[in-house]
Structure formats: C-alpha cells, structure tokens
Regions:
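Core-facing hydrophobic residues within beta-strands of well-ordered domains
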Residues: 23-25, 146, 182
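Glycine- and charged-residue-rich phosphate/anionic-cofactor binding loop of Rossmann-like
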Residues: 24-26, 299, 317-334
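Beta-loop-alpha module in the N-terminal Rossmann-like domain of NAD(P)-dependent dehydrogenases
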Residues: 46-112, 306
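A contiguous active-site-proximal alpha/beta segment in oxidoreductase catalytic domains
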Residues: 90-93, 98-162, 166-171
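Contiguous beta-strand/loop segments that form the cofactor/metal-binding neighborhood of enzyme cores
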Residues: 170-269, 308-324, 338-342
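Active-site loop of classical SDR/Rossmann-like NAD(P)-dependent oxidoreductases
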Residues: 31-34, 238, 299-311
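Conserved small/polar residues in nucleotide/adenosyl-binding loops
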Residues: 347-349
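N-terminal Rossmann-like dinucleotide-binding module
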Residues: 1-44
Length: 349
C-alpha cells in the first residue's frame, strides 16, 4: 500500500519483497491511478483486478497473507495496520516512523495481538550483520562496562523535532538494542535558545504529530545500566552528517554510522584517553576488519540487503509464532520515547 499523492512509497520497501523465495506479490493499492500503474509495473502485475485505488477494497477482495504499508506519510499507518489485522493478514511490514502517538501504538498492538498478526518495522540498520558483531564485541568485554550511548540525528533542515521523529527511530532503536529498555527520561527542547512552550508546536511534515524546537537534547536511563543521550540541532553546519551513535565504555568505544560502509568502528581505549594515538578500526560482518573500505560497494544495494533480512525476519516470525526483532513493541517503545521528550521539555511551564 502506497499513497503517491501524499508521501509516496517511502524508501521503496515494497521492492524488498521482489524475488524473495516463497513470496508472490498479488496486488497493489495507491490513491492515484499513476501510482497504481507504476506499482503494478514494478511488481509485474498484468491483471487490472490486481490494482486498487482503495486499500480497504484490496484487503477485502484479495485477503493477502502479508501487507506492506509503504507510505512515507504516517497519517494512516495506524488505521491501515488495524484494518489489516482485522482482515486477518498474518504479517505487516511497515515503513517507519511507526504511528503518530502512543494511543495509536497501543491500538495497533491490541489489534495485532487479537489476530496474532506479526508486524515488523523497516528499521533496516538493525539488520546489518555488523550490528551482530558489535553485540559480540560488547559481550566479549572489548568496551569494558558500557557507560553511555550517544546518538545524533542528521541535523539538517529537519534538525530538532522533525529529526527526532523521522531519523530518530534508527538511532533510538539501536540505543535500546545495545543499552536496554528506557526506564526514565529527561529532556529539553528549545527554539533559538529559549525553552519551547505549548504555543510553539506546529504540525509536523509527512504526518508526524505536533512538534516544536530547533534543538533537542534528551537523556534516557537504560535497563542494562548505561545512560542514553539523543541530540539534534537544526543545520548544525557539518558537511558530513552527524547521524549515528557512539557507545562509550570504560575500556573502549564504538562509533556507528547508519547506512555507510564500514558501518561501525572500534577504538581500543575510552574516549577520554588521549595520551597516545588509538586508531579507529573498521568493524565488519565477522569481526574487526582493518582493511574494510567502501571501495566498490553499492551502498543502496547493501541497504536493500538489510531490508530483505528484515522481511525474512517477519516471515520467520509468522512461521514460528514469535515477535520480529524490530516489531510492534519496538515501535511502541520508540513512540513512548518521542512523546516523553516533549512531555519532559514542557515540565518547566
């Protein structure tokens, strides 16, 4: 399901199903005729009855096993997911962000639990094999005690509230993955250096809820012990995007750069040790990889391969009756973190 008139097909997550063993695309839905035609061409659907202008009609007529909610605009994400679950689909693959509010997230979770529908989010960076290597390095004690997980958004024109909602899911998901579920939050949102007030909130782009602030800083107490930090400042001024997160330990640190190759680097010393050089070593899919570079690497193809792993995880979750790695409860947690940031930033009012 896409909405070409309002946000398009996101990061082309529908194409992740093309060529997957055991999966066949049987129908597409869009809200404009050209969108339907383009989607049918992508998925080689030749029967006119396989293209719909009304996604509800598609659910009723086709009764698919899996629905991909691809719209970049999240205004209808919750409605679509609930309707799909109530229609009896076995799985839902959804573009991030998840939904607009914790209330909507709770409703989606309830609907999916009632129908035993599995839902996975397209948080594809979690599925990069390098992330498993990072977990192994932490478990092997290479970082010592993990003290902090520091994350930043892309800090472009979306810096602040929009960055939190649109890019935040990737780094906040990894924060929780490595540091544990959030237990508490402290946050400040400012506009031109002044704390935001309720009057500063405006509707966000692409269906995200009311947002405010050109700069956000937030701290989260994480269940496994470390403190998580998220920050985003509009137009921070760096040509190289700040997007990513750093894991700080007593013996070493790891820096993660989502969407890049190498995706992570290890330094065998804590961040504050400067008495001699400690080089950053690339981390590969099977361990430290000093010679790993991005030469000859198609980043788009790599990212798509991680997305297909997310699809495979959803399929396996359906077949084995388990929760996917970045499933609806992950989406609920991320939505709770976003709402907590603004709730805490307004405490001073």
């Amino acid at each position: 399901i896409g909405t070409s008139s309002n946000g398009g097909w996101g990061h082309n997550i529908d194409e992740l199903f093309i060529g997957v063993s055991g999966i066949r695309t049987v129908a597409v839905a869009d809200d404009i005729n050209t969108g339907v035609a383009d989607a049918m061409k992508r998925h080689r659907l030749t029967q006119a009855t396989r293209g719909f202008l009304d996604w509800r009609q598609m659910l009723a007529n086709i009764k698919p096993d899996i629905v991909a909610i691809c719209s970049r605009n999240i205004q209808q994400h919750a409605e679509m997911a609930i309707a799909a679950a109530e229609a009896g689909v076995r799985g839902i693959f959804m573009e991030k962000p998840f939904v607009q509010s914790v209330t909507q997230a709770d409703a989606v979770v309830a609907a999916c639990e009632t129908s035993n529908t599995k839902l996975n989010l397209a948080l594809v960076n979690r599925y990069c094999p390098t992330m498993a290597t990072v977990s192994e390095l932490i478990a092997d004690g290479k970082l010592g005690t993990l003290l902090e997980v520091r994350a930043r958004g892309k800090e472009d024109v979306r810096g602040g509230g929009e960055d939190l909602w649109v890019l935040g899911p990737h780094v906040l998901d990894l924060m929780v993955h490595f540091g544990g579920a959030p237990q508490w939050c402290s946050a400040t949102a400012t506009t031109k250096g002044k704390p935001v007030t309720p009057d500063d909130f405006i509707a966000g782009a692409e269906g995200i809820p009311m947002i405010a602030g050109d700069s956000i800083t937030a701290s989260f107490g994480l269940a496994d012990g470390p403190t998580g930090f998220f920050a985003s400042t509009r137009e921070a001024g760096l040509k190289q995007p700040n997007f990513g997160l750093t894991l700080l330990g007593t013996k070493g640190e790891i820096h993660i750069r989502p969407d890049y190759i190498p995706q992570a680097y290890f330094r065998a010393a804590p961040a504050w040790r400067m008495n001699r050089p400690y080089p950053w070593t690339p981390i590969g899919d099977e361990g430290l990889a000093p010679d790993l570079t991005d030469q000859g690497v198609d980043r788009s193809a790599k990212r798509a391969s991680w997305g297909r792993l997310a699809v495979a995880d959803l399929i396996d979750a359906i077949q084995t009756d388990r929760e996917p790695e970045t499933g609806m409860f992950t989406g609920l947690t991320l939505t709770e973190m976003n709402e907590a940031v603004y709730a805490l930033s307004l405490i001073h009012i």
